[in-house]
């Protein structure tokens, strides 16, 4: 089968950059963001308003429980997916009512940061303006429970997709205990690919065995010709795995050929790729699991497992395609001056004669100076399609948004990536991996052109 060339006009070194993805889940640090600042929680008493609260006709059983069931309990239910805080009962919700109101009003919760007017996405658990107002009013009125005998019907909670079968299960080569002396431990582990024939990965589900310390995982696919480079990195460190940040390590040549295979963040479920498409893996390849452990969750060990749905019959071409300006990666052109607000930079890529592909999802990545970011297509006919826009960037909540309808790109279209930052520090910033550095990156799952409805 023919393989379309990558639309990227630059070397693929930028594939090795960090992206804290929530595949289709709740993201990281759920409990912290729900409850708000500890001082705020203490001031509020950690619960419903005291005397003098305004009155309301809204109650938990009649009005609020359906909202929570659909948009909150995927993370904050009795068996929530990584949020850590159970808000499935009127008693628990009332206990946290005022912090909940603050988080909902500020749009920190639920952690759905895609702009409402950009596009439509699968599994949208965001709150409408009307539902936000209801939650805030109910909380500030003392979080009344209402009558359970006349409770409204509860819609099902959003749950991430699951693999319909698992053809291959891989795990870290050893159980690893992160260094408790540092809050963040980035560690890469080389994992053998056991199949002796061409294969196409059509779905992934990454499952850390200790979610209390696992912050995120990125799986990189290393082609056979570059395996020796990563084996040398692994052998050079006496401890399990080897240290890494921003990618799997490797030299500039190997970073041009490695690809992304999957990613995970707390609350995330399986990534199921579009029907008839898959990521090709050649015999002799290896995987690198980049683990980001956060030891603030307590001590402990982890041995992350990766479930894969795999086809041995050829699938339609697909790639996890990053977008950024290679000049930024090389330290040119993405200057963010000290003590300056509203600094924006933009990257454009014009689709050439051979570029015909479809976007199926999109994710954006910046660091903590980020204010807003967007990815859109300016079509040759003058129309424009927004893929993803995040107007209030939150470093703690980064996820991949799966488009309800794929967006086709044809020759002459332009893909436009734009990022804006506020640099409140006394140091100039530019592209880099440190906490005082910044990035502007988008990643997308692309395939051959997709039939339009």
Model-derived segments and their meaning:
Residues 78-81, 115, 142:
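Acidic glycine-/aspartate-rich tracts in secreted/extracellular proteins
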Residues 56-73, 80-82, 92-95:
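Short sequence/structural segments immediately N-terminal
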Residues 23-57:
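Ser/Thr-rich, Pro/Gly/Ala-heavy low-complexity intrinsically disordered linkers and tails
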Residues 84, 114-121, 149-358, 363-453:
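Beta-strand-centric surfaces of beta-sandwich/beta-rich domains
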Residues 1-24:
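Sec-dependent bacterial lipoprotein signal peptides
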Residues 67-79, 87, 109, 135, ...:
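The canonical Cys-X-X-Cys-His
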Residues 65, 69, 73, 101, ...:
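Non-transmembrane alpha-helical segments in soluble domains
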Residues 91-139:
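Extracytoplasmic electron-transfer domains, predominantly the class I c-type cytochrome c fold
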């Amino acid at each position: 089968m023919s393989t379309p060339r990558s639309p990227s006009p630059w070397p693929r070194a930028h594939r090795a950059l960090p992206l804290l993805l929530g595949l289709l889940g709740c993201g990281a640090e759920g409990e912290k963001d729900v409850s708000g600042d500890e001082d705020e929680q203490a001031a509020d008493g950690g619960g419903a308003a005291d005397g003098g609260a305004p009155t309301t006709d809204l109650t938990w059983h009649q009005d609020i429980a359906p909202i929570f069931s659909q948009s909150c309990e995927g993370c904050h239910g009795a068996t929530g997916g990584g949020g850590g805080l159970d808000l499935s009962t009127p008693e628990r919700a009332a206990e946290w009512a005022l912090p909940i109101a603050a988080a909902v009003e500020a749009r920190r919760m639920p952690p759905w940061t895609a702009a409402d007017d950009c596009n439509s996405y699968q599994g949208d658990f965001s709150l409408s303006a009307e539902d936000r107002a209801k939650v805030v009013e109910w909380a500030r009125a003392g979080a009344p429970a209402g009558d359970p005998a006349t409770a409204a019907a509860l819609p099902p909670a959003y749950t991430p997709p699951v693999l319909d079968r698992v053809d291959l299960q891989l795990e870290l080569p050893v159980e690893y205990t992160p260094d408790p002396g540092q809050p963040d431990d980035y560690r890469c582990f080389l994992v053998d690919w056991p199949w002796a024939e061409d294969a196409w990965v059509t779905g992934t589900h990454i499952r850390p065995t200790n979610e209390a310390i696992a912050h995120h995982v990125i799986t990189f696919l290393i082609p056979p010709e570059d395996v020796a480079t990563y084996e040398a990195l692994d052998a050079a460190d006496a401890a399990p795995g080897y240290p890494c940040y921003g990618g799997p390590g490797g030299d500039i040549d190997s970073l041009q050929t490695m690809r992304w295979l999957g990613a995970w963040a707390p609350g995330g479920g399986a990534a199921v790729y579009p029907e008839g498409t898959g990521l090709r893996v050649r015999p002799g390849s290896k995987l690198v699991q980049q683990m980001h452990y956060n030891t603030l969750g307590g001590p402990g060990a982890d041995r992350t497992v990766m479930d894969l749905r795999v086809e041995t019959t050829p699938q339609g071409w697909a790639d996890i395609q990053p977008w950024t300006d290679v000049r930024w990666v090389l330290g040119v052109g993405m200057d963010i001056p000290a003590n300056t607000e509203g600094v924006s930079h933009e990257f454009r890529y014009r689709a050439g004669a051979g570029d015909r592909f479809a976007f199926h999802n999109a994710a954006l990545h910046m660091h903590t100076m980020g204010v807003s970011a967007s990815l859109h297509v300016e079509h040759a006919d003058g129309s424009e399609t927004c893929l993803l826009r995040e107007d209030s960037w939150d470093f703690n909540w980064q996820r991949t948004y799966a488009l309800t309808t794929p967006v086709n790109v044809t020759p002459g279209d332009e893909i436009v990536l734009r990022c804006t930052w506020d640099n409140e520090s006394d140091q100039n910033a530019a592209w880099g991996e440190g906490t005082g550095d910044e990035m502007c990156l988008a990643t997308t799952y692309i395939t051959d052109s997709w039939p339009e409805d």
